């Protein structure tokens, strides 16, 4: 079966320089899991913060309402708790206090036993000229690949 990727945050790689990645579990309700299995999630504006109780919380991640549920609908943009080891939380809390670092969601996926996981990236924002340099580099690679294919 392997890993089934539900949604990716492609914009994150353009807007941020990813320094390190972490894997975390998510506390979800039943309809949210079913909605994610259908690929109905959006990570674009999401971010993670550690609250006063030392828990990692996921903000602004949109998981659409599951259309076949009949009981209490869940708020699509609700704050969700993330499950990390205490040691990882302390390490992340120290790094997040550094200037310019943020913790952003990169992708949501399901592992073999059916549990939803989220990959988080410790990121530093890119300047406009860094974004332009990255785009030029990607275009150069595409041109080279195109020339190599033509032979």
Swiss-Prot record:
Pfam families: SmpB (PF01668). Its main location: cytoplasm. InterPro entries: SmpB (IPR023620), SsrA-bd_prot (IPR000037), SsrA-bd_prot_CS (IPR020081). GO terms for biological process: trans-translation. The keyword Membrane does not apply. Keywords: Cytoplasm, RNA-binding. It is found in: Cytoplasm. Transmembrane segments: none annotated. The keyword Secreted does not apply. CDD domains: SmpB. GO terms for cellular component: cytosol. GO terms for molecular function: RNA binding. Required for rescue of stalled ribosomes mediated by trans-translation. Binds to transfer-messenger RNA (tmRNA), required for stable association of tmRNA with ribosomes. tmRNA and SmpB together mimic tRNA shape, replacing the anticodon stem-loop with SmpB. tmRNA is encoded by the ssrA gene; the 2 termini fold to resemble tRNA(Ala) and it encodes a 'tag peptide', a short internal open reading frame. During trans-translation Ala-aminoacylated tmRNA acts like a tRNA, entering the A-site of stalled ribosomes, displacing the stalled mRNA. Belongs to the SmpB family. NCBIfam families: PRK05422.1, smpB. This is SsrA-binding protein. It comes from Desulfotalea psychrophila (strain LSv54 / DSM 12343). The lineage of its organism: Bacteria, Pseudomonadati, Thermodesulfobacteriota, Desulfobulbia, Desulfobulbales. The gene is smpB.
């Amino acid at each position: 079966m392997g890993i089934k990727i539900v949604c990716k945050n492609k914009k994150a790689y353009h807007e941020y320089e990813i320094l390190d990645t972490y894997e975390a579990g998510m506390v979800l309700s039943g309809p949210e899991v079913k909605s994610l299995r259908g690929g109905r999630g959006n990570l674009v504006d999401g971010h993670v913060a550690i609250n006063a109780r030392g828990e990692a919380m996921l903000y602004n991640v949109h998981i659409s309402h599951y259309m076949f549920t009949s009981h209490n609908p869940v708020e699509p943009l609700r704050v969700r708790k993330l499950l990390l080891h205490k040691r990882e939380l302390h390490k992340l809390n120290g790094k997040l206090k550094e200037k310019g670092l943020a913790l952003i969601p990169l992708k949501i996926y399901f592992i073999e036993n059916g549990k939803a996981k989220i990959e988080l990236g410790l990121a530093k924002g890119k300047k406009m000229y860094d974004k332009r340099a990255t785009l030029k580099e990607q275009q150069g690679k595409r041109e080279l690949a195109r020339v190599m294919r033509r032979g």
